[in-house]
Regions:
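Exported/periplasmic ABC-transporter solute-binding proteins
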Residues: 24-56, 60-62, 67, 71-77, ...
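Bacterial N-terminal signal peptides that target proteins for export
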Residues: 1-11
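Bacterial N-terminal signal peptides
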Residues: 10-20
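Active-site-adjacent helical/loop segments in soluble small-molecule enzymes
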Residues: 111
Protein backbone atom coordinates (compact mmCIF):
# COMPACT_ATOMS: atom_id res chain seq x y z
CA UNK A 1 0.00 0.00 0.00
CA UNK A 2 2.79 2.40 0.97
CA UNK A 3 4.69 1.59 -2.23
CA UNK A 4 1.63 2.39 -4.36
CA UNK A 5 1.08 5.65 -2.48
CA UNK A 6 4.75 6.55 -2.93
CA UNK A 7 4.56 5.92 -6.68
CA UNK A 8 1.43 8.07 -6.97
CA UNK A 9 3.08 10.93 -5.10
CA UNK A 10 6.20 10.64 -7.30
CA UNK A 11 4.08 10.68 -10.46
CA UNK A 12 2.16 13.71 -9.21
CA UNK A 13 5.41 15.56 -8.48
CA UNK A 14 6.71 14.82 -11.97
CA UNK A 15 3.47 16.13 -13.48
CA UNK A 16 3.64 19.35 -11.46
CA UNK A 17 7.33 19.89 -12.23
CA UNK A 18 6.81 19.15 -15.91
CA UNK A 19 4.00 21.72 -16.08
CA UNK A 20 6.20 24.35 -14.49
CA UNK A 21 9.12 23.63 -16.79
CA UNK A 22 7.03 23.80 -19.98
CA UNK A 23 7.37 27.58 -20.03
CA UNK A 24 11.12 27.36 -19.52
CA UNK A 25 14.04 26.46 -21.73
CA UNK A 26 16.28 23.48 -21.15
CA UNK A 27 18.47 25.68 -18.94
CA UNK A 28 15.54 26.41 -16.63
CA UNK A 29 15.26 30.04 -17.73
CA UNK A 30 11.86 31.39 -18.82
CA UNK A 31 11.23 31.45 -22.56
CA UNK A 32 9.54 34.48 -24.11
CA UNK A 33 7.64 33.47 -27.25
CA UNK A 34 7.63 36.16 -29.95
CA UNK A 35 5.44 35.99 -33.07
CA UNK A 36 6.99 38.51 -35.46
CA UNK A 37 6.59 39.74 -39.01
CA UNK A 38 9.20 38.21 -41.31
CA UNK A 39 10.83 41.57 -42.09
CA UNK A 40 12.11 41.51 -38.50
CA UNK A 41 13.96 38.21 -38.71
CA UNK A 42 17.52 39.50 -38.98
CA UNK A 43 17.25 42.52 -36.70
CA UNK A 44 15.50 40.57 -33.93
CA UNK A 45 18.07 37.78 -34.18
CA UNK A 46 20.80 40.42 -33.83
CA UNK A 47 19.14 41.69 -30.64
CA UNK A 48 18.65 38.22 -29.21
CA UNK A 49 22.00 37.52 -27.44
CA UNK A 50 22.27 40.82 -25.59
CA UNK A 51 18.63 40.88 -24.52
CA UNK A 52 18.74 37.27 -23.33
CA UNK A 53 21.76 38.04 -21.19
CA UNK A 54 20.11 41.18 -19.85
CA UNK A 55 16.78 39.58 -18.92
CA UNK A 56 18.11 36.14 -17.95
CA UNK A 57 15.58 34.56 -20.26
CA UNK A 58 15.40 32.91 -23.66
CA UNK A 59 13.73 34.32 -26.76
CA UNK A 60 11.96 32.00 -29.17
CA UNK A 61 10.85 33.54 -32.47
CA UNK A 62 8.15 32.50 -34.90
CA UNK A 63 8.38 34.57 -38.09
CA UNK A 64 5.67 34.83 -40.74
CA UNK A 65 3.23 37.19 -42.40
CA UNK A 66 1.46 39.46 -39.92
CA UNK A 67 -2.00 38.41 -41.09
CA UNK A 68 -1.26 34.71 -40.75
CA UNK A 69 0.24 35.18 -37.29
CA UNK A 70 -2.73 37.30 -36.16
CA UNK A 71 -5.13 34.60 -37.34
CA UNK A 72 -3.17 31.94 -35.49
CA UNK A 73 -3.23 34.03 -32.31
CA UNK A 74 -6.98 34.55 -32.69
CA UNK A 75 -7.33 30.78 -33.02
CA UNK A 76 -5.45 30.10 -29.81
CA UNK A 77 -1.72 30.27 -30.56
CA UNK A 78 0.00 31.00 -27.26
CA UNK A 79 2.70 33.64 -27.53
CA UNK A 80 3.93 36.43 -25.29
CA UNK A 81 4.60 39.13 -27.92
CA UNK A 82 3.11 39.94 -31.31
CA UNK A 83 5.23 42.25 -33.48
CA UNK A 84 3.33 43.13 -36.64
CA UNK A 85 4.45 44.81 -39.85
CA UNK A 86 1.48 47.16 -39.59
CA UNK A 87 -0.98 48.52 -37.04
CA UNK A 88 -4.16 46.93 -38.42
CA UNK A 89 -3.51 43.40 -37.19
CA UNK A 90 -2.56 44.59 -33.71
CA UNK A 91 -5.75 46.64 -33.65
CA UNK A 92 -7.77 43.56 -34.63
CA UNK A 93 -6.34 41.63 -31.68
CA UNK A 94 -6.95 44.59 -29.40
CA UNK A 95 -10.62 44.73 -30.44
CA UNK A 96 -10.84 41.01 -29.69
CA UNK A 97 -9.45 41.71 -26.19
CA UNK A 98 -6.40 39.53 -26.86
CA UNK A 99 -3.67 42.01 -25.92
CA UNK A 100 -2.74 43.43 -22.54
CA UNK A 101 -4.00 47.00 -22.07
CA UNK A 102 -1.41 49.76 -22.45
CA UNK A 103 1.18 47.51 -24.11
CA UNK A 104 0.34 48.36 -27.74
CA UNK A 105 3.09 50.52 -29.21
CA UNK A 106 4.60 51.78 -32.45
CA UNK A 107 8.19 50.60 -32.81
CA UNK A 108 9.09 51.38 -36.44
CA UNK A 109 7.94 52.49 -39.87
CA UNK A 110 8.99 50.19 -42.70
CA UNK A 111 10.17 50.99 -46.22
CA UNK A 112 9.94 49.00 -49.43
CA UNK A 113 12.47 48.69 -52.24
CA UNK A 114 12.68 47.40 -55.78
CA UNK A 115 15.21 44.57 -55.62
CA UNK A 116 17.02 42.56 -58.29
CA UNK A 117 19.73 39.91 -57.95
CA UNK A 118 23.18 41.46 -57.52
CA UNK A 119 24.47 39.77 -60.68
CA UNK A 120 21.43 40.67 -62.78
CA UNK A 121 21.94 42.56 -66.03
CA UNK A 122 18.50 44.16 -65.73
CA UNK A 123 18.42 47.94 -65.38
CA UNK A 124 15.47 48.42 -63.07
CA UNK A 125 15.50 51.85 -61.42
CA UNK A 126 11.79 52.71 -61.16
CA UNK A 127 8.47 50.94 -60.83
CA UNK A 128 7.75 51.88 -64.45
CA UNK A 129 10.76 49.78 -65.51
CA UNK A 130 8.93 46.69 -64.28
CA UNK A 131 6.64 47.02 -67.32
CA UNK A 132 9.48 45.89 -69.59
CA UNK A 133 8.84 42.49 -71.15
CA UNK A 134 12.23 41.12 -70.10
CA UNK A 135 11.17 41.47 -66.44
CA UNK A 136 9.25 38.21 -66.57
CA UNK A 137 8.66 37.43 -62.88
CA UNK A 138 8.13 39.99 -60.11
CA UNK A 139 8.01 38.84 -56.49
CA UNK A 140 5.92 40.45 -53.76
CA UNK A 141 4.49 39.11 -50.53
CA UNK A 142 0.86 38.04 -50.71
CA UNK A 143 -1.10 41.29 -50.23
CA UNK A 144 -4.05 39.42 -48.72
CA UNK A 145 -2.22 38.86 -45.44
CA UNK A 146 1.23 40.47 -45.67
CA UNK A 147 1.46 44.25 -45.05
CA UNK A 148 4.58 44.56 -47.22
CA UNK A 149 2.75 42.84 -50.06
CA UNK A 150 -0.15 45.24 -49.62
CA UNK A 151 2.26 48.19 -49.75
CA UNK A 152 3.86 46.77 -52.90
CA UNK A 153 0.46 46.46 -54.56
CA UNK A 154 -0.49 50.00 -53.56
CA UNK A 155 2.79 51.36 -54.95
CA UNK A 156 2.32 49.56 -58.26
CA UNK A 157 -1.23 50.86 -58.50
CA UNK A 158 -0.19 54.42 -57.64
CA UNK A 159 2.57 54.28 -60.26
CA UNK A 160 0.04 53.11 -62.85
CA UNK A 161 1.79 49.81 -63.61
CA UNK A 162 -0.31 47.28 -61.68
CA UNK A 163 -2.40 46.14 -64.65
CA UNK A 164 0.72 45.74 -66.78
CA UNK A 165 2.50 43.46 -64.30
CA UNK A 166 -0.22 41.64 -62.35
CA UNK A 167 0.03 38.51 -64.53
CA UNK A 168 3.78 38.32 -63.88
CA UNK A 169 3.59 38.47 -60.10
CA UNK A 170 5.04 35.68 -57.98
CA UNK A 171 3.46 35.79 -54.52
CA UNK A 172 5.44 34.79 -51.46
CA UNK A 173 3.62 33.59 -48.37
CA UNK A 174 5.47 36.34 -46.52
CA UNK A 175 8.00 39.08 -47.22
CA UNK A 176 10.96 36.86 -46.43
CA UNK A 177 9.94 34.29 -49.04
CA UNK A 178 9.35 37.02 -51.63
CA UNK A 179 12.88 38.27 -50.96
CA UNK A 180 14.25 34.75 -51.35
CA UNK A 181 12.55 34.45 -54.74
CA UNK A 182 14.58 37.43 -55.96
CA UNK A 183 17.82 36.37 -54.29
CA UNK A 184 17.70 32.87 -55.79
CA UNK A 185 16.73 34.08 -59.27
CA UNK A 186 13.25 32.58 -59.12
CA UNK A 187 12.04 36.12 -59.78
CA UNK A 188 13.73 38.73 -61.97
CA UNK A 189 12.80 41.52 -59.58
CA UNK A 190 10.72 42.11 -56.51
CA UNK A 191 9.26 44.71 -54.18
CA UNK A 192 10.42 43.73 -50.72
CA UNK A 193 11.24 45.22 -47.29
CA UNK A 194 14.29 47.44 -47.09
CA UNK A 195 15.31 45.59 -43.91
CA UNK A 196 15.57 42.27 -45.75
CA UNK A 197 17.36 43.83 -48.72
CA UNK A 198 19.96 45.27 -46.33
CA UNK A 199 20.46 41.90 -44.67
CA UNK A 200 21.08 40.34 -48.10
CA UNK A 201 22.97 43.27 -49.64
CA UNK A 202 25.71 40.99 -50.99
CA UNK A 203 23.09 39.22 -53.09
CA UNK A 204 20.68 42.03 -54.00
CA UNK A 205 20.66 45.49 -55.55
CA UNK A 206 17.89 47.72 -54.22
CA UNK A 207 16.24 51.05 -54.98
CA UNK A 208 13.93 52.75 -52.45
CA UNK A 209 10.29 53.16 -53.44
CA UNK A 210 8.79 56.59 -52.80
CA UNK A 211 6.85 56.23 -49.54
CA UNK A 212 4.09 58.52 -50.85
CA UNK A 213 3.01 55.73 -53.22
CA UNK A 214 1.65 53.54 -50.42
CA UNK A 215 0.11 53.78 -46.98
CA UNK A 216 2.72 54.04 -44.20
CA UNK A 217 3.93 50.72 -42.83
CA UNK A 218 3.42 51.69 -39.19
CA UNK A 219 4.72 48.64 -37.39
CA UNK A 220 3.19 47.99 -33.98
CA UNK A 221 3.62 45.39 -31.27
CA UNK A 222 1.93 44.34 -28.05
CA UNK A 223 2.07 41.85 -25.19
CA UNK A 224 -0.62 39.18 -25.40
CA UNK A 225 -3.13 38.41 -22.69
CA UNK A 226 -2.36 35.12 -21.02
CA UNK A 227 1.39 35.66 -21.38
CA UNK A 228 3.24 33.62 -18.77
CA UNK A 229 6.07 36.11 -18.78
CA UNK A 230 4.34 39.45 -19.36
CA UNK A 231 7.03 41.37 -17.48
CA UNK A 232 9.83 40.00 -19.65
CA UNK A 233 7.69 40.35 -22.79
CA UNK A 234 7.17 44.03 -21.97
CA UNK A 235 10.90 44.33 -21.27
CA UNK A 236 11.64 43.00 -24.77
CA UNK A 237 9.42 45.63 -26.38
CA UNK A 238 11.06 48.30 -24.21
CA UNK A 239 14.43 47.04 -25.46
CA UNK A 240 13.32 47.22 -29.11
CA UNK A 241 12.13 50.79 -28.56
CA UNK A 242 15.18 51.66 -26.43
CA UNK A 243 18.63 50.17 -26.79
CA UNK A 244 17.55 48.30 -29.91
CA UNK A 245 16.80 51.50 -31.84
CA UNK A 246 20.30 51.72 -33.31
CA UNK A 247 20.01 48.20 -34.73
CA UNK A 248 16.54 48.97 -36.08
CA UNK A 249 17.92 52.06 -37.80
CA UNK A 250 20.88 50.14 -39.25
CA UNK A 251 18.43 47.65 -40.71
CA UNK A 252 16.52 50.32 -42.59
CA UNK A 253 13.63 51.10 -40.28
CA UNK A 254 12.43 54.63 -39.61
CA UNK A 255 11.98 55.03 -35.87
CA UNK A 256 9.11 56.69 -34.00
CA UNK A 257 9.67 60.44 -34.00
CA UNK A 258 12.04 60.37 -36.98
CA UNK A 259 11.29 61.69 -40.45
CA UNK A 260 10.62 59.39 -43.38
CA UNK A 261 12.71 61.62 -45.61
CA UNK A 262 16.11 59.92 -45.82
Amino acid sequence: MRRRLGKRIAALLLLVLGTGLSACGGDGRPTVLVAAASDLRFVFEEMEPQFEERCECNLEFSFGSSGTLATQISNGLKVDVFASADSDYVEQLEKASLILPLTRQLYAVGRIVIAVPADSELEVETLADLREAHVRRIAIANPDHAPYGRAAKQALQSAGVWEAVVDRLVLGENASLATQFVETGNADAGIVPLSLAISREEHLRAILVDESLHEPLRQEAAVLKGSRHADKAAAFLAYVNGEGRSLMRQNGFVLPGESLQR
